[in-house]
A protein has these predicted regions:
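Compact recognition or signaling/catalytic modules
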Residues: 122-212
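Active-site rim helix/loop that mediates acceptor-substrate recognition in acyltransferases
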Residues: 1-8, 110-138
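Short amphipathic alpha-helix that is part of the acyltransferase structural core
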Residues: 1, 83-117
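Short glycine-aromatic motifs
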Residues: 5, 12, 65-69, 130-131, ...
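Conserved donor-binding loop and adjoining core beta-sheet/short helix segment
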Residues: 1-43, 136-160
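Acyl-donor-binding surface of acyltransferase catalytic domains
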Residues: 31-89, 166, 173, 179-181, ...
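Alpha-helical elements of Rossmann-like donor-binding domains used by nucleotide-donor carbohydrate transfer enzymes
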Residues: 43, 100-104, 165, 169
Length: 212
């Protein structure tokens, strides 16, 4: 399902992210400008519901702040020293294995708030950018992730206790001077993990409110 970067009504302009509707039945509304914010929001909600969204979130205008907070998206940064004893075997994702990598991460991240679903049409871009890996040790899959330059875009472990090995293995490729990532405020387990790894919260990037 395609997104609407510009959704124009007589009440104002918004952008609609609908790509998660087929997977998570979620839609995201960002109000760009509003002459009548209540009416604009209602039109956006109505459209999102019409295409199948059951959970709808919004941001971009003070009007939506009266609704329950769903989550905030936090930025975390830090200088991380790779612990070599925790580095395992890295298998670069290829055209033949991109689907398997994508499916694994989607399954692991589906319960996480604001975690976007990886689609097959985005595989080539990931391959072109590089930095996507499986992490193995002794013939067993420990996890997978995607490190693009200094940004850790995705990471998931295949079993409890493997997170640190996956983390240090991914960072061993380029050893960025300062690592950056984004995490939902509701993902407290991940935040605690990243803090143990040496990262700190540096900014609140945006807030999403549950409007339906």
């Amino acid at each position: 399902m395609r997104d609407f970067p510009v959704f124009t009504t007589e009440y104002g302009v918004a952008s609609l992210v609908l790509r998660e509707v087929p997977y998570r039945q979620e839609a995201y509304i960002t109000i760009q400008s509003a002459l009548q914010p209540e009416e604009l929001l209602n039109e956006c909600i109505s459209f999102c519901r019409m295409v199948g969204a059951e959970k709808i979130f919004a941001r971009g205008h003070a009007y939506v702040e009266q609704y329950p907070l769903h989550c905030a998206i936090l930025e975390m940064r830090g200088c991380v020293e790779v612990e070599e004893e925790k580095v395992s075997n890295l298998w670069p994702v290829t055209k033949e294995t991109a689907g398997q990598w994508r499916q694994f991460l989607n399954e692991k991240l589906r319960p996480i708030d604001n975690a976007g679903t990886l689609e097959s049409k985005g595989e080539q871009e990931i391959l072109d950018l590089g930095g996507a890996y499986f992490v193995h040790r002794d013939g067993q899959l420990l996890g997978a992730g995607w490190l693009a330059g200094e940004e850790l875009k995705l990471i998931a472990s295949a079993k409890p206790g493997a997170g640190e090995q996956v983390f240090h293995s991914l960072l061993s490729v380029d050893s960025p001077e300062q690592l950056r990532l984004e995490v939902a405020s509701t993902n407290e387990r991940a935040i605690r993990f990243y803090e143990r790894m040496g990262l700190v919260k540096t900014a609140e990037l945006r807030r999403w409110y549950r409007v339906h």
